[in-house]
């Protein structure tokens, strides 16, 4: 059965995932597009629901877990959920993992700390660059854009599934790295 109405209660809940308040309340976020969905599944992230349109032609490229519920949606619903001009017709609804502060104890590697970076595109670019450069992770400090903001998620292009990316207090991390004699710049 296909969901065709943008007034459907499920559609309204999915649309709320485009807001920080909605993501926090549902403890989920949305992936928009084939590449992001494939990266999440490849990284064994819990994709609770997969929303696809009848025109989506790449379903055979995706290994879907038995736990993932596949829901057919209309093009109109797809356009109402997406924040892009031309949605690809596939969305993943992903659980936000609870991330406790666990400082690395050895083999720290390089970490990028971002303080007050509010532009989603800039965050995504820096996370992708850190991933490509072999960094261990990225820490978004206070005042930075929300990690699960759809624009940030889209800009990271799946790099968030390759390295650790967390929102946390930078001063604790700086103190930890200095205690370990790791240079902090």
Question: Residue locations for each model-derived region?
Answer:
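Short, hinge-like loop/turn segments at secondary-structure boundaries
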Residues: 67, 90, 155-159
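Short, aromatic/basic amphipathic alpha-helical patches
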Residues: 58-67
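Short acidic-hydrophobic, aromatic-tinged amphipathic segments that line or gate anion-handling sites
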Residues: 2-5, 71-74, 163-173
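Short active-site oxyanion
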Residues: 25-28, 46-49, 67-69, 137-138, ...
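RNA substrate-binding interface of SAM-dependent RNA methyltransferases
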Residues: 42, 103-185
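Glycine/small-residue-rich loop that forms an oxyanion/phosphate-binding "nest" at active or ligand-binding sites
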Residues: 69-95
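Acidic/glycine-rich phosphate/pyrophosphate-binding loops and surrounding catalytic core
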Residues: 85, 89-90, 94-107, 144
